[in-house]
Amino acid sequence: MAESENRKELSESSQEEAGNQIMVEGLGEHLERGEDAAAGLGDDGKCGEEAAAGLGEEGENGEDTAAGSGEDGKKGGDTDEDSEADRPKGLIGYVLDTDFVESLPVKVKYRVLALKKLQTRAANLESKFLREFHDIERKFAEMYQPLLEKRRQIINAIYEPTEEECEYKSDSEDCDDEEMCHEEMYGNEEGMVHEYVDEDDGYEDYYYDYAVEEEEEEEEEDDIEATGEENKEEEDPKGIPDFWLTVLKNVDTLTPLIKKYDEPILKLLTDIKVKLSDPGEPLSFTLEFHFKPNEYFKNELLTKTYVLKSKLAYYDPHPYRGTAIEYSTGCEIDWNEGKNVTLKTIKKKQKHRIWGTIRTVTEDFPKDSFFNFFSPHGITSNGRDGNDDFLLGHNLRTYIIPRSVLFFSGDALESQQEGVVREVNDAIYDKIIYDNWMAAIEEVKACCKNLEALVEDIDR
């Protein structure tokens, strides 16, 4: 009995010493925790053998301890194999455990750290590329300025385009090179009519010169145009009225933001520009809304600045996503008294409890308006409001402002509608396929029920 008790005490003390040794080594180095854990589990029975060698007094007791620890190591190895069988689920779309990397072997963890270092270097190169790309954008923005300035002058009736500048071929008038060569070969002289049918058909008499006839009609209408010329000059508006208001209202994401009381102010827009940050400054772009002098606010320029993420965070460089917007800031609008469309003023009458005197108190409450877009309070990427604001700023910079005439004329809307129609057709097609599959499944179920009924009849 005494000998068995001594053997039990020796085995317990050896296991305790081995566990303490593992804990000390684990606190020493973070990356060697996997080795210590593996040694603690005793995959090869090494912990038991080291503990038995440390005792060195009773070989048989040491062998028993080593054997016991070896069995524990086998059990631990079995549990590791079971957990490894479950790990691939995380790679198929399931949420990975936070200690997934910690559970990997030490050599594998070293390789993962090497890959992370490579990823950091790649992100540094990407950030450098984006900064240089921003410089190229700035260079071409200067080349665009003459075109954008002429657009502003035409919209605001500062410049009247010539007839040559107004010549624009629509899609129906476009022709390819083969058709142009065909016209050059067969001639296209004024007053000359081409005969595209055989002479024996007798249809030549029906062809006449439309150009000559139009000239005759124009001569007959010269008197009418001369009499109404003065009235037309008075009726013709200057420039393109409500250009920017129409553009903004034709944008799906902006339409819900524009209220009736915003439209009179947006009619005063003379131009919307995109200004990129100067060299050496943090990457950003500013949307500039230029207004005519008006009765609503004293500002003639309202701005919204979007700061881009162009550098890696020292504490965590891996979530880098390119030129994502970090935050945005608006400007302070100097509203004239009683003209602030972003606030709703309510007057209340209050009666004094003791004296009975009545006083009028006014309270301001925020209300929906397009001009909340210029809120001076910074908006970060946290939250849904930030994502919506960043998407709107990106669309204004990239699509709406450079292609404003397409949104004014509705050409951009047609492309948007085509995309919507395509999505609807795809949804309808998917619904038809789904219905067909469900009908086939119901038929299979009915056949199964019939087979079950036949089997029951046979059994009877």
UniProtKB/Swiss-Prot annotation:
Entry GO MF terms: chromatin binding; histone acetyltransferase regulator activity; histone binding
Taxonomic superkingdom:
Eukaryota
On whether Nucleus is a keyword of this UniProt record, the answer is yes
Record region (Disordered): 1-88, 214-238
Basic and acidic residues bias locations? 1-11, 27-36
Pfam families given in the database record = NAP
Which terms under GO biological process does the entry name? Answer: neuron differentiation; nucleosome assembly; positive regulation of neuron differentiation; regulation of stem cell division
Biased region (Acidic residues) positions are 214-236
Q: Does the keyword Nucleotide-binding apply?
A: no
User: Which residue windows are coiled coil?
Assistant: none
List the ranges annotated as motif Nuclear localization signal.
346-352
Which cysteines pair up through disulfides? They are none
Where in or outside the cell is it found? Nucleus
Q: Keywords on this record? A: Nucleus
Which GO cellular component terms, listed alphabetically, does the Swiss-Prot or TrEMBL entry include? chromatin; nucleus
User: According to its UniProt record, which protein family does this protein belong to?
Assistant: Belongs to the nucleosome assembly protein (NAP) family.
Q: What is this protein called?
A: Nucleosome assembly protein 1-like 2
Its organism's taxonomic lineage begins at: Eukaryota, Metazoa, Chordata, Craniata, Vertebrata
Q: What gene codes for this chain?
A: NAP1L2
